[in-house]
């Protein structure tokens, strides 16, 4: 609120005389009364000119101030005539009438905080001093509230001011850096005398006869005399004449208060020092007497004709006789720090003394001689007015308790018609850095449930979130007292944000340390306290009640959002980390799909939709808007259609919550400086209030952007705003510790009420059709509520808004398709299209990406011509290959889809696992329960019985239906999966993604377009275990050059990679994060972990600390169903007892803090860094116990650089999430691209061969296929014992799951041919210990449960390596006496299965030797020679096989059908499931073994150089030559790159 003319606030009488417009009466009827401005609700219809400036300024008035900023007696004064008390509150002078408990306010128009004030002797004027540069001394008329005079004469702030008793002069003293003392003739606005002082002055006082005044300060007591005769003769400024008081031995004291005597003591001057000395000076400036107050510290002083009041520490106010300095009494102490004001219902409670209680210090005193009232201000920002007529019976007249530090947030308690309310109607809450949450109510009518307490008429309750009381007192100003308490002040304390649940039962609050608390509002008990974040919580939001959900979102400066389930005792549902900087606001909306919208300092707005998965609720990103300015706050209107965002450029941008498109942008602040910090939409959705960093507040029409009112009064930035539900008040809070209640003008209130009435009328016909339940689909469950049909502003839209509402609702969504027809060649974003793109689309006026179809075939020219090539050889961007990723399918077209849900990450399992790691052993915390695994194996058994072979184009990645590892999606998402909907996997076309983002997404396997349902060949990649057809044999081989998406296929691609990713490194040496979740526990002396907190954020980030940061560039995915292998007994060479420990086969599973020792001369690396590589070259997966490796130091393990990023994807080491990594936008781009830098990761010594060029394209393609199989199927290793990390979705990046790049970056490996392993180098993994290094024995298992490595690698060797390895000469076991023996028994395999396997040893003999064991002694093999094939033996074997398999199958079905399963039955069920999977994998492996041994001679390869395998006939000889040429260019480019490096 601004003032008129000279700057004072003048009440507008015209506004007060306006007739009240009743709610529901049309606003047109009110035009008969001439208001100062047209009715707001008609402005859009009539398009009238804006209201005059004075009307705008007076539509909102300041009604009440809850707060005080007085730091000493200079900020408190009293009118001697009326008894009114004036004190400072930011930029406002509050004039309090204690009898009536009413306030009047004078606002400083200069927007500078006030530092001092004083009443004139007659009480008509108030003089104020300011802070800041070039402060002014202003004179205000108390009655008119306007400015009378303004005097400029200081530079750096005014410390104290005073009227002379004869009202001729005003004295002002500057701050320490100003040190100017001015005497003003305020009626003439001139300085009559001036001087500079040499030390800091704290207080001053005029003598009763106005002949002199006294200033006191640091070792300073000085008397200044006014020469009247000199003033009459000299017209200019004259120097002041000053004389110092004679202090004697007290000259080293710092004096903080001074008062000249009154009445009989008019010739005396009284001073008080910080050290607790009360001194009296006589007329000759001589220290006459002094006494010790016997306190640790004193701060203020005031006198009457008979009494002296000295304010001291611990709430003490001592009273002395003025003429003798005899001690009389002490004032009663105020409340003790930490008092429960709700318990103070009786007056006697004030005088109840608590043992060891601490009381607030007294900082300011003023005395009313007429009423004998002493006003006291205490250090906790409380005010007491004591009646001291009888010092032996002192009573309290009035009191109030305010916040003592920054107020961060305000919430208005919801309105309830029944008895559910926990607080009276009209209550609101504020939270502050003083560690309190305060409940206020301005209603003067007492509520039956809430009686008024004796401390305050407005304060209902104080909740103390911490037991520490040091923050309850104002620690921001120490007036040269030093750190007398000797304790350090934690400036990061306090409650930062809070939110009341929609049902009014719970209060969620987040503090500045990252803790989340939940209070129950009936009894104010703390229900939940969670260390949620590593930095201060910036936003809390409950889900809307109409959504049918009870969720709480917590956003923090640590850039993470935690979604908690209220119904499950605030358990963690999901953690989102899309943002790369502080998250400033998060909101829920219930329009159509239930959404979460968040904005942050990274200039991004993320729109997420909710999906119901089997393991809980997950939010998947649907839109991303990237602005060019920082976003500080946002709010959603009542229709849930639009979100208003406060931006740093002082604009308010309004976005559609459905499609994320910007609808409006208008100015949110009337000034030209600062940034918008807060925005809040009123309950009717008619207006919004904004706060700017210039400390101003604006009320703006939400639809037109016109400024309705502007106010100011806070001295610090406004940190929170809320409209009350009665549409009458606006509450603002600020960093100046004050709460302002603004009264809205009648025209604003009536317009809001009319809008609410119209909304209710429109909603009545829809009451029977609203439904907030989940809309369940066979493939996915999306949280939806019925869309509100409320228009932007009923009957008040502009033409373009009316046209928009006439459009079908479907246009706001990403269009769905009935079939997989081709999408446009270019993927459209929110930006404008270039001319060639418009021509390509056949429409030059295309502006929306909702529905596009090419109308004519236009071929672009230049470099874009290659992008439209129709040949099977694809370049970087071909939109037709991405057609199934960007347009959702109708639900009926998803009948046969295996994709059920797209799950995001969860931390519930991680949190539970971290608490009890020994309970689950090596099992993943979110590993499937038996019934979950049973469904998985049942699907497998069905596929076994029906003998169905699923080809590549028909195979689809599946998601778990149980409570599996969320976010662990298949690595096969680069396949063309026609049934995957873009709503689940990809952002819609209007999501704000740029074409540059999509240009990086050529990672998909670019298969040719499908002209007919039966193409000549299909691209097949084995799905992960757990999906139907996961273990089926591949029907057709892959096509070289087409299926290998990990290799750049053109020089343009290679150039693109070099240009965009040449700065990426695959072996960062300086990793900031060390240790995993286990390392977060009790830190030892030499542990130097970056964050000791075990918050949810710390545990979330700890999952990404151990692996190489280079893997973060590539979002990796786990198989949906991680399988448990049979238990393998492992023996330690040191003589420890063997213990059974379930390990995952083929994963290199190891415990944190332990490493496997490689060959001599190599540094120790974790097993997970080399075991997958071993598997990829041998086809076998070693299962090594962590107990067989000597433990290393207990220091946090150093980061491990994986051999290749492609391998890292297969191993699935979680990506590092840190504050030094790329932003969300750049990370999204990098996640779909790769660097061609050479790998710096560890390489096995046996594989360290010099790079050599492949002999042919076939070898290069086969190597790429090998790497593809490894990156696709290797099961991840764990970085924490007893659990397997489930990679989160990297901030809901499932939308880009199909665009993941898996290109390997090991250039040397690309130059190497597949290793030629001789049969003599092959060994069988046995249970006998194999020496790796001296004194280190590793026991390995011959057979393990099938894993993706076993299934895919064996199939891989069938097509590429094994024919070359085994065909040149038959396997002769006698020629290899050192071969290890086959085991007698296989752990985890039933006896009948073991006998079956033993009877057919030929199928098991050709096994490779692990490269990690090359050069070590081999154990002689005990393999019986193959005997003659007898039909009787075959029949017996077949009979036993059928019987055993049927018995096992029946037993398994019986256990699965039971509802309750015991622990033993669960173990047996797991054993059977693992065995079935193992049999399936062995059958696949047996197929190629039999084909190799029993093939005719002409089918066997010749012993000469192997020829490149022809996996699929090429389309033409020209294409074959073209691929050869591209291969040559690629090899040359890679070699040049390697040579330069």
Curated annotation (Swiss-Prot):
Subcellular compartments: Nucleus; Cytoplasm, Cytoskeleton, Spindle pole; Cytoplasm, Cytoskeleton, Microtubule organizing center, Centrosome; Cytoplasm, Cytoskeleton, Microtubule organizing center, Centrosome, Centriole
Superkingdom, natural source: Eukaryota
Keywords tagged on the record: Acetylation, Cytoplasm, Cytoskeleton, Nucleus, Phosphoprotein, Repeat, WD repeat
Coiled coil stretches, renumbered: none
Biased amino acid composition, Pro residues: 1008-1026, 1193-1202
Residue spans of biased composition, Acidic residues class: 797-809
UniProt WD repeat ranges: 109-150, 153-194, 196-234, 291-330, 357-396, 402-450, 490-529, 532-574, 578-618, 626-665, 671-713, 714-752, 803-846, 1138-1180
Basic and acidic residues bias locations: 770-780, 810-820
Modified residues (Phosphoserine): 33, 501, 943, 1095, 1125, 1151, 1235, 1255-1256
Any one GO biological process: cerebral cortex development
Residue list for modification Phosphothreonine: 46, 1050, 1275
Matches recorded under InterPro entries: Quinoprotein_ADH-like_sf (IPR011047), WD40/YVTN_repeat-like_dom_sf (IPR015943), WD40_MABP1-WDR62_1st (IPR056161), WD40_MABP1-WDR62_2nd (IPR056162), WD40_repeat_dom_sf (IPR036322), WD40_rpt (IPR001680), WDR62 (IPR052779), WDR62-MABP1_CC (IPR056364)
Gene Ontology annotations for the cellular component aspect, listed alphabetically: centriole; centrosome; cytoplasm; nucleus; spindle pole
Cited SUPFAM superfamilies: Quinoprotein alcohol dehydrogenase-like (SSF50998), WD40 repeat-like (SSF50978)
Low complexity composition-biased segments: 937-948
Polar residues compositional bias, start-end: 781-795
Residue numbers carrying N-acetylalanine: 2
Record's function text: Required for cerebral cortical development. Plays a role in neuronal proliferation and migration. Plays a role in mother-centriole-dependent centriole duplication; the function seems also to involve CEP152, CDK5RAP2 and CEP63 through a stepwise assembled complex at the centrosome that recruits CDK2 required for centriole duplication.
Subunit structure: Can form homodimers (via C-terminus). Interacts (via C-terminus) with MAPKBP1 (via C-terminus). Interacts with CDK5RAP2, CEP152, CEP63 and KIAA0753. CEP63, CDK5RAP2, CEP152, WDR62 are proposed to form a stepwise assembled complex at the centrosome forming a ring near parental centrioles.
Protein's recorded name: WD repeat-containing protein 62
UniProt organism field: Sus scrofa (Pig)
The encoding gene: WDR62
């Amino acid at each position: 609120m601004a003032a008129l003319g000279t700057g004072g606030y003048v009440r507008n009488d015209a506004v007060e005389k306006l007739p009240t417009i009743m709610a529901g009466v049309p606003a047109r009827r009110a035009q008969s009364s001439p208001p100062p401005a047209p009715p707001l609700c008609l402005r859009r219809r009539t398009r009238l000119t804006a209201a005059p400036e004075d009307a705008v300024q007076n539509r909102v008035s300041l009604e009440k101030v809850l707060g005080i900023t007085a730091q000493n007696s200079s900020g408190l004064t009293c009118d001697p005539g009326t008894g009114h008390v004036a004190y400072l509150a930011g930029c406002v002078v509050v004039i309090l009438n204690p009898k009536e408990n009413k306030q009047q306010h004078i606002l400083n128009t200069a927007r500078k905080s006030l530092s001092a004030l004083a009443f004139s002797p007659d009480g008509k004027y108030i003089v104020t001093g300011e802070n800041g540069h070039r402060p002014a001394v202003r004179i205000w008329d108390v009655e008119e509230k306007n400015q009378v005079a303004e005097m400029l004469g200081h530079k750096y702030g005014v410390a104290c001011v005073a009227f002379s008793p004869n009202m001729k002069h005003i004295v002002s003293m500057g701050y320490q850096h100003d040190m100017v003392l001015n005497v003003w003739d305020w009626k003439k606005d001139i300085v009559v005398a001036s001087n500079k002082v040499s030390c800091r002055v704290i207080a001053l006082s005029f003598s009763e006869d106005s002949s002199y005044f006294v200033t006191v300060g640091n070792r300073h007591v000085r008397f200044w005399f006014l020469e009247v005769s000199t003033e009459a003769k000299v017209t200019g400024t004259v120097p002041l004449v000053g004389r110092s008081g004679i202090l004697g031995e007290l000259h080293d004291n710092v004096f903080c208060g001074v008062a000249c005597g009154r009445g009989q003591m008019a010739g005396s001057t009284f001073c008080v020092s910080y050290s607790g000395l009360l001194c009296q000076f006589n007329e000759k400036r001589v220290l006459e007497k002094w006494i010790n107050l016997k306190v640790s510290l004193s701060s203020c002083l005031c006198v009457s004709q008979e009494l002296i009041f000295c304010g001291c520490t611990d709430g003490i106010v001592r009273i002395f006789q003025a003429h003798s300095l005899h001690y009389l009494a002490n004032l009663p102490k105020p409340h003790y720090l930490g008092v429960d004001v709700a318990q103070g219902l009786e007056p006697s409670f004030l005088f109840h003394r608590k043992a060891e209680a601490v009381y607030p210090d007294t900082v300011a005193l003023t005395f009313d001689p007429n009423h004998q009232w002493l006003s006291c201000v205490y250090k906790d920002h409380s005010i007491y007015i004591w009646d001291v007529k009888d010092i032996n019976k002192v009573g309290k007249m009035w009191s109030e308790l305010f916040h003592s530090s920054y107020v961060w947030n305000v919430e208005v308690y919801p309105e309830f018609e029944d008895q559910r309310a926990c607080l009276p109607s009209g209550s609101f809450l504020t939270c502050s850095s003083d560690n309190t949450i305060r409940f206020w109510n301005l209603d003067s009518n007492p509520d039956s449930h809430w009686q008024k307490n004796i401390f305050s008429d407005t304060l209902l309750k104080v909740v103390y979130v911490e037991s520490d009381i040091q923050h309850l007192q104002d620690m921001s100003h120490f007036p040269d007292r030093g750190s007398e308490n000797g304790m350090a002040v934690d400036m990061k304390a306090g409650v930062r944000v809070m939110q009341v649940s929609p049902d009014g039962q719970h209060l969620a609050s987040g503090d500045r340390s990252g803790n989340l608390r939940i209070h129950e509002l009936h009894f104010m008990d703390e229900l939940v306290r969670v260390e949620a974040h590593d930095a201060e919580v910036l936003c809390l939001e409950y889900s809307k009640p109409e959504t049918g959900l009870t969720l709480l979102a917590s956003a923090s400066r640590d850039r993470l959002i935690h979604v908690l389930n209220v119904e499950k005792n605030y358990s963690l549902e999901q953690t989102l980390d899309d943002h790369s900087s502080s998250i400033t606001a998060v909101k829920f909306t219930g329009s159509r799909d239930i959404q979460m919208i968040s904005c942050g300092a990274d200039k991004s707005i993320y729109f997420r939709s909710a999906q119901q998965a089997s393991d809980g609720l997950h939010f998947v990103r649907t839109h991303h808007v990237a602005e060019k300015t920082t976003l500080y706050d946002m709010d959603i209107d009542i229709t849930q259609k639009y979100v208003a965002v406060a931006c740093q450029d002082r604009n308010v941008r309004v976005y559609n919550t459905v499609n994320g498109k910007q609808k409006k942008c208008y100015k949110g602040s009337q000034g030209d400086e600062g940034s918008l910090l807060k925005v809040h939409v009123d309950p009717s959705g008619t207006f919004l209030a904004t706060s700017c960093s210039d400390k101003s507040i604006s009320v703006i029409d939400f639809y037109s952007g016109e400024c309705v009112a502007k106010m100011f009064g806070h001295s610090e930035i406004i940190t929170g705003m809320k409209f009350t539900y009665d549409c009458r008040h606006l509450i603002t809070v600020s960093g100046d510790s004050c709460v302002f209640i603004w009264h809205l003008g009648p025209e604003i209130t009536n317009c809001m009420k009319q809008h609410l009435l119209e909304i209710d009328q429109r909603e009545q016909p829809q009451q029977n059709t609203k439904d907030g339940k989940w809309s369940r689909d066979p493939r996915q469950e999306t949280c939806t509520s019925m869309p509100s049909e409320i228009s932007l502003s009923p009957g008040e839209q502009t033409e373009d808004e009316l046209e928009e509402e006439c459009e079908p609702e479907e246009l706001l969504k990403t269009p769905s398709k009935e079939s997989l027809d081709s999408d446009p060649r270019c993927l459209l974003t929110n930006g404008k299209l270039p001319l060639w793109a418009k021509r390509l689309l056949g429409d030059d006026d295309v502006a929306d990406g909702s529905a596009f179809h090419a109308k004519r075939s236009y071929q672009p020219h230049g470099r874009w011509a290659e992008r439209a090539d129709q040949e099977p050889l694809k370049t970087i961007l071909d939109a037709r290959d991405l057609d199934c990723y960007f347009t959702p399918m109708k639900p009926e077209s998803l009948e046969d889809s295996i994709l059920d849900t797209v799950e995001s990450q969860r931390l519930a399992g991680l949190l539970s696992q971290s608490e009890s790691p020994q309970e689950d052993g090596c099992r993943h915390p979110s590993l499937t329960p038996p019934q979950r695994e049973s469904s998985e194996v049942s699907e497998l058994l069905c596929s076994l019985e029906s003998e169905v072979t699923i080809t590549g184009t028909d195979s689809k990645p599946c998601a778990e239906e149980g409570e599996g590892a969320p976010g662990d999606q298949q690595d096969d998402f680069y396949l063309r999966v026609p049934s995957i909907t873009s709503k689940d996997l990809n952002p819609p076309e209007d999501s704000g993604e740029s074409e540059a983002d999509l240009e990086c997404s050529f990672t998909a396997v670019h298969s040719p377009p499908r002209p007919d349902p039966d193409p000549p060949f299909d691209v097949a990649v084995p799905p992960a275990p757990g999906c139907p057809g996961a273990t089926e044999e591949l029907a057709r081989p892959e096509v070289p050059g087409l299926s290998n998406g990990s290799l750049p296929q053109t020089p343009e691609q290679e150039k693109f990679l070099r240009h965009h990713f040449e700065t990426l490194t695959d072996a960062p040496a300086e990793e900031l994060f060390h240790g995993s979740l286990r390392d977060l526990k009790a830190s030892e002396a030499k542990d130097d972990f970056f964050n000791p907190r075990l918050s949810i954020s710390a545990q979330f980030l700890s999952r990404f600390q151990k692996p190489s940061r280079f893997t973060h560039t590539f979002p990796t995915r786990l198989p949906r169903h991680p399988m448990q292998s049979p238990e393998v007994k492992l023996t330690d060479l040191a003589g420890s007892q063997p213990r059974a420990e379930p390990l995952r086969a083929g994963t290199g599973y190891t415990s944190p803090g332990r490493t496997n020792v490689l060959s001599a001369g190599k540094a120790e690396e974790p097993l997970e860094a080399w075991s997958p590589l071993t598997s990829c070259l041998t086809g076998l997966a070693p299962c090594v116990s962590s107990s067989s490796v000597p433990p290393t130091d207990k220091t946090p393990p150093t980061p491990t650089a994986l051999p290749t990023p492609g391998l890292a994807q297969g191993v699935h080491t979680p990506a590092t999430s840190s504050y030094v990594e790329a932003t969300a936008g750049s990370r999204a781009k990098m996640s779909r691209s790769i660097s061609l830098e050479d790998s710096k990761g560890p390489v096995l010594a046996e594989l360290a061969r010099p790079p050599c060029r492949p002999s042919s394209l076939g070898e290069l393609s086969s190597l790429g296929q090998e790497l593809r199989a490894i990156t696709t199927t290797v099961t991840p290793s764990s970085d924490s014992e007893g659990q397997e990390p489930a990679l989160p979705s990297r901030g809901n990046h499932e939308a880009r799951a199909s665009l993941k790049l898996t290109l390997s970056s090991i250039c040397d490996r690309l130059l190497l041919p597949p290793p030629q392993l001789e049969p003599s180098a092959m060994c069988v993994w046995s249970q006998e210990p194999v020496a790796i290094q001296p004194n280190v024995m590793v026991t390995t298992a011959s057979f393990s449960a099938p894993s993706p490595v076993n299934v895919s690698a064996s199939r891989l060797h069938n097509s590429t390596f094994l024919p070359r390895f085994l065909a040149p000469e038959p396997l002769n076991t006698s020629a290899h006496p050192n071969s290890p023996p086959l085991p007698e028994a296989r752990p985890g395999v039933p006896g009948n299965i073991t006998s079956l396997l033993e009877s057919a040893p030929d199928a098991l003999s050709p096994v490779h030797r692990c490269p990690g064991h090359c050069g070590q002694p081999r154990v002689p093999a005990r393999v019986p020679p193959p005997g003659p094939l007898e039909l009787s033996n075959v029949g017996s074997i077949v009979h036993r096989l059928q019987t055993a398999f049927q018995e096992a199958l029946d037993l398994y079905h019986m256990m699965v059908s039971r509802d309750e399963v015991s622990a033993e039955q669960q173990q047996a069920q797991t054993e059977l499931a693992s065995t079935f999977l193992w049999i399936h994998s062995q059958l696949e492996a047996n197929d190629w073994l039999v084909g190799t041994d029993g093939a005719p001679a002409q089918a066997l390869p010749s012993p000469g150089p192997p020829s490149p395998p022809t996996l699929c006939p090429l389309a033409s000889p020209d294409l074959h030559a073209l691929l050869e040429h591209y291969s040559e260019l690629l090899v040359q480019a890679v070699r040049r790159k390697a040579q330069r490096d």
